[in-house]
Amino acid sequence: MTPDTPGREVEIVRAGPLTTVQDRGRPGYAHLGVGRSGALDQPAHRLANLLVGNPPGAATLETTIGGVALRALDGPVVVSVCGAVAPVHVDGRPAAWAAPVYVPTGAVLEVGPAVSGVRSYVAIAGGLLAELVLGSRSTDLLSGLGPAPLRDGDRLAVAPLPSAFPAVDPTPVSAPADSLIELAVLPGPRAEHFGAEAWRTLTRAEYRVQDQSNRIALRLGGPVLARQGPDSIPSEGAILGALQVPADGLPILFLADHPPTGGYPVIGVVPDEALHHAAQAGPGTRVRFRAANLGGPGIAHL
């Protein structure tokens, strides 16, 4: 069988508030108006795949706060759950988080509500086989590309099991911070629209994640960032990690499903390496921005 030949199926018993299929996303298509999408917490996504012997870019399930339940239909599966810490059970029996878990044929894997963080990643050995769109199986909520968000009763094909499982370092995995995160920020392409006082406010004040946040962006509440230029600008390309400031002066941090263009000035950019922290920040989480320099510690690239 080829890598894309279905080996088994799993059934979604409980989809939770929002469960989507995600992988590395669709980088490189911004010039066509297509955003990157992909798993918001890429390190957790990669670790979940590693634990079950998958390539790091294999598709996983990304849950949001409420978890998910799935049944192994026509053969056993090996799964792992990483990212947001959540209770894991197989047919009601406790199972491990951030470790390989065997799910027999007909059994139900239950990932409960997150107790630390927001998004859990469920990898299944072999990888999920949702349709490829522009080289990715990811759901993009803004554009509608990729598979629709999962519903109860949906079935997903799983590729055949890998021939061997790798040895994995059993070092404990840290739980996501659930009360305060600190994000590095670089000056943005429209920083000149803001005075020095606005930059000081951004990098010294504390913000809180608002309820309206989603895979498109983190909306932040806190001190207003006063600008010296116009409230809006002609639409221009937007990137992952951009801190856009609309007319109300409250920053919005673009995440994986962000729009390809934006019409408000971007005061700063959070580098890719820090965005997994933002992926696990739920409503009420405190956020601090730390001024950074391109090429400085922890800043590999944008």
Label the predicted regions:
Residues 1-302:
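Conserved "landmark" site that anchors the functional core of diverse proteins
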